[in-house]
Amino acid sequence: MDVLGWLLLPLLLLCTQPHHGARAMNDIGDYVGSNLEISWLPNLDGLMEGYARNFRPGIGGAPVNVALALEVASIDHISEANMEYTMTVFLHQSWRDSRLSYNHTNETLGLDSRFVDKLWLPDTFIVNAKSAWFHDVTVENKLIRLQPDGVILYSIRITSTVACDMDLAKYPLDEQECMLDLESYGYSSEDIVYYWSENQEQIHGLDRLQLAQFTITSYRFTTELMNFKSAGQFPRLSLHFQLRRNRGVYIIQSYMPSVLLVAMSWVSFWISQAAVPARVSLGITTVLTMTTLMVSARSSLPRASAIKALDVYFWICYVFVFAALVEYAFAHFNADYRKKRKAKVKVTKPRAEMDVRNAIVLFSLSAAGVSQELAISRRQGRVPGNLMGSYRSVEVEAKKEGGSRPGGPGGIRSRLKPIDADTIDIYARAVFPAAFAAVNIIYWAAYTM
């Protein structure tokens, strides 16, 4: 039995092998499709035979027409300090290479990204890019498709930091225009011609973007030839997009604190003139706080020569805050001057009364002698000279007393009377808010229109 069993074992294995093989084929067929036919696939080795990737299609003839299309994935960062923005885009390029045409089928062939290294590619680059890189997670983010007539679609994902010249004169009430310039690096217009794809009527993705500081209001496409004397003309395609700054965050962070500081400085107008420490400390605190706010707001901006709208508003508020402090100094000076003047009047008034009484006494004592001399002079028909001199002296002294008397008619001090300190505060309560409101109307009209 043992010998018979060993003889039958190979036969049993042969009988069972087709059954297991059919089951395996069925499992694979259920997964990949049992009716898969790839007879239409072109012979890539035959297409690439004699292919020279270092030469453009149709070299020596008409230039290659390259259609470009953009799809924006994100705009990650816009920096005013560095005048740049970071954008991630899908760049689609399409051109025809007749050397790769296969006309026996209408199927489009999707190729592995590694096949890109074997093809001729347009040398497109971003002109105003500061830095750029390709994405390679989990594989290189490149797509290439080959159509039967030799048309190649090449798509790549690029993240680039691009320069953007900004005019910050109206910051933060400004609108900026940034560009993305695409150009051939080595091929002139005699070898390659760029044009926007017919499907590029709008940039996909821009309508879904949510930027923290800006809103994209519009965009447009341009095509131009750049002239270089030493190299010729090079085609350039540009995407221009308008950015309007979102003003809400700046109103909350910069404008409203400045307005509140100015209003806080007006509180001193309702504080008594006698409360010197309170009014001085309030004025100095508002001035220093306004200075700190100005410095912190400017730290995130470039040191540009242009005066920005935010700087103008900060200086307007700074002037009003400082003027409120100066107003108290002026009012306090007037109050102190009035006190000293009243004290001086009280001292000089008794002296003036004493001088008048002394003059009356002297006049009474000399009245008898003057009368006798006057009688003698009348009999002789003349007026004594010393009497005329006395009259003139009295007249001059009277004029002096009238002109120099405090508060007298025609006096200089009567025309320059110091204003009461409380009256100055009352005027300031109305003048400062009205002037600040008028300046704000002019400011917002000038920078928002």
UniProtKB/Swiss-Prot annotation:
UniProt xrefs under PROSITE patterns: NEUROTR_ION_CHANNEL (PS00236)
Keyword S-adenosyl-L-methionine: no
Membrane topology listed for this record: Multi-pass membrane protein
Catalytic activity: chloride(in) = chloride(out)
UniProt topological domain (Cytoplasmic) ranges: 272-275, 332-423
GO cellular component terms attached to this protein's record: axon; chloride channel complex; dendrite; GABA-A receptor complex; GABA-ergic synapse; glutamatergic synapse; neuronal cell body; plasma membrane
InterPro entries given in the database record: GABAA/Glycine_rcpt, GABAAd_rcpt, Neur_chan_lig-bd, Neur_chan_lig-bd_sf, Neur_channel, Neuro-gated_channel_TM_sf, Neuro_actylchol_rec, Neurotrans-gated_channel_TM
Glycosylation sites: 103, 106
Spans traversing the lipid bilayer: 252-271, 276-298, 309-331, 424-446
SUPFAM superfamilies: Neurotransmitter-gated ion-channel transmembrane pore (SSF90112), Nicotinic receptor ligand binding domain-like (SSF63712)
Subcellular location: Cell membrane
UniProt keyword Iron, yes or no: no
Described purpose of this protein according to its UniProt entry: Delta subunit of the heteropentameric ligand-gated chloride channel gated by gamma-aminobutyric acid (GABA), a major inhibitory neurotransmitter in the brain. GABA-gated chloride channels, also named GABA(A) receptors (GABAAR), consist of five subunits arranged around a central pore and contain GABA active binding site(s) located at the alpha and beta subunit interface(s). When activated by GABA, GABAARs selectively allow the flow of chloride anions across the cell membrane down their electrochemical gradient.
Subunit structure: Heteropentamer, formed by a combination of alpha (GABRA1-6), beta (GABRB1-3), gamma (GABRG1-3), delta (GABRD), epsilon (GABRE), rho (GABRR1-3), pi (GABRP) and theta (GABRQ) chains, each subunit exhibiting distinct physiological and pharmacological properties.
Comment on protein domains: GABAARs subunits share a common topological structure: a peptide sequence made up of a long extracellular N-terminal, four transmembrane domains, intracellular or cytoplasmic domain located between the third and the fourth transmembrane domains.
Protein name as it appears in the record: Gamma-aminobutyric acid receptor subunit delta
